[in-house]
């Protein structure tokens, strides 16, 4: 079985993403795990290169997109997303994208052993927080082999709720 579904009900208005990610990491029985935001799409070659770099021992952590002007901000609607899913033609996304900066979030491939040894996700962060930068610096400073693939990340733009922007009630303590 390649897929396991777990549902965890919560009435807490705060989505404690880092805690949920840590629980999923510990449930995983694979050598490689991916911290993957649901609003991004990568070129297939990026998935393959990131996986291969860890599998072959070249890296412990891989950011499957470049740093700098490597984000394609996609202003997509349901029709464009459906067209892309049916055809797998990235031109559908490119037509409604603009280039923007990319840094630390979206997706990271990890050797699971390294992710656990390095402390996994920092549960002291709550809601929207600078956890993406903290994670990058922590794993780099701990001496793990962190690399990037110089390719684009497609970020599906969306509205922001209480848990997903700078104005969340926990930002000051993060």
Question: For each predicted feature, which ranges?
Answer:
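Glycine-rich, basic loop-to-helix element that forms the pyrophosphate-binding segment
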Residues: 11-27
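Short, high-confidence coil segments that cap the C-terminus of an alpha-helix
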Residues: 30, 58-60, 144
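Active-site acidic short loop of glycosyltransferases
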Residues: 28-31, 120
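Conserved catalytic core of nucleotide-sugar-dependent glycosyltransferases
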Residues: 43-123
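Short beta-strand-to-loop acidic/aromatic patch adjacent to the donor-nucleotide binding site
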Residues: 31-41
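Conserved glycosyltransferase catalytic-site signature
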Residues: 17-22, 39-40, 47, 103-108, ...
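C-terminal catalytic/acceptor-binding lobe
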Residues: 124-174
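Acidic donor-binding segment of Leloir-type glycosyltransferases
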Residues: 1-11
């Amino acid at each position: 079985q390649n897929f396991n579904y777990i549902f965890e009900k919560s009435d807490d208005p705060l989505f404690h993403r880092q805690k949920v990610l840590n629980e999923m990491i510990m449930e995983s029985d694979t050598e490689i795990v991916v911290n993957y935001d649901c609003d991004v799409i990568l070129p297939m070659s990026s998935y393959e290169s990131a996986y291969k770099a860890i599998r072959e021992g070249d890296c412990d952590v891989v950011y499957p997109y470049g740093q700098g002007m490597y984000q394609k901000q996609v202003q997509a609607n349901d029709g464009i997303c459906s067209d892309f899913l049916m055809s797998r033609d990235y031109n559908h996304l490119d037509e409604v994208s603009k280039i923007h900066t990319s840094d630390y979030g979206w997706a990271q491939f990890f050797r699971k052993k390294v992710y656990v040894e390095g402390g996994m996700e920092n549960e002291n962060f709550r809601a929207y927080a600078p956890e993406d930068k903290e994670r990058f610096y922590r794993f780099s400073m701990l001496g793990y082999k962190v690399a990037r693939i110089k390719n684009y990340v497609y970020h599906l733009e969306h509205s922001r709720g209480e848990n997903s922007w700078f104005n969340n009630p926990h930002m000051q303590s993060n």
